[in-house]
Amino acid sequence: MAFNRTLAEGINHMPLGRQHYRIWITAAAGFLFEGLDLTIAGGILIALIKAFHLNNTYAGVIGSTALAGYVVGVAIAGWLGDKFGRKFVISYTLLVFTLLTLLSALSWNGIIFGILRFLVGIGVGGESAIVTPYLAEIIPARVRGRLLGLSDAMFTVGAIIASVVNLVVIPAGPWGWRLALVIAGLPAAYVWVIRRNLPESPQWLANHHQLEEAEAVIRQLAPINETSDLDPPIGHPVSSASFKTTEHPSNNLYTLLWSTPYARITAALWIVWFFIELVYYGFLVWLPELLVKHGFTVVKSLEYAFLMNIAALLGGIGASFVQDSRLGRKSSIIFFFFLSGIASYLFSISHTDSGILAAGATLSFLLNGLFSMLYTFTPEQYASWNRSTGQGFASGVGHIGGVIGPLLIGVVLSAIGMAGIFGLFAVFLLVPIVAVLFLRETRAQPVERT
């Protein structure tokens, strides 16, 4: 038969090979460093309050500065990724993160630390905008949900490592928080070096009429000895006619996000991301301090945060497989949001140590499972010409919620307490269910179906 599959279909039918795993590990490492950074930032908040004599409101501002930078980072990186290529952006985002994280360890007051954390957030935001669109265009459809979901689970691996760092390093002395930031920044430098050898997305290359380069990437992904079940193997000569390119009408942001049929998709995704990140980052940044205010020692609060991160890792891994099951993306996401609302309510009414740990671990499991699915589901809603912009702005709007979450806790904690905060979060977690109903199911669909 003639080889007339589109490029995306060729990738979807490709066997999963060594190159896929190499690319996945190198790209997904960005999520690990994001989790490492944000969890260390939450852990050192207690030390910063003492070192810089911060009140709750100012501590909330400090906790939100990286998230504010994240909003800027996703907006810039998403647009750059669609215009200049995924590799262009992914090659530099970790460099920004590494340098600024190391510099933040030298901060001498809260203002300097906040400014540097804002700049760190720009690098972290760039990672979030580009990694999953990049992987979505390279990973075969039948395992895309699992590998993209597991990419986000790397965030929790980083958070678990950070919890150990927080537990061991921060209490060691007044310099502990500085050393924790150095530990967060140094490993990222190595990943940045090897990441420069990643290939460009073949779909992006084809859409920008670089067909020979796209074919070369396909050959790299699927060498002849791994493609014997394709008809014909991708190792055979491929003409430019084999590639289906998607003309993008404009680089105008309004067209990228709000043209038909993307207006409905964009609005729904922004609602979903805003509310989940408001809850998640409020929970993540303030959890150790909230537990201390509940009566736990600093060490005990960090131990509980570590156990909740273990639960979060299991949630991310589990959700990665659930979304590739017959249940599909939409039903899985709705189910997890509903259960998250219940878990948050249970956390709000828990008074015993075991009750707080059980409800908190369940909430961590479900929230991280949701992120694993949303980082798969969101780029699948867009086409290659607006995919990283769509992912970036959805995540960016979400991080506006992520900025509000820690600030909200800092402002109202003394008035309504931990119980009131998590009761409110329970309501916030039910709102996205309605928005998800307006999105299409994408399980096992070619990434370029639109």
Positions of PLM-derived features:
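Transmembrane-helix signature of 12-pass secondary carriers
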Residues: 1-450
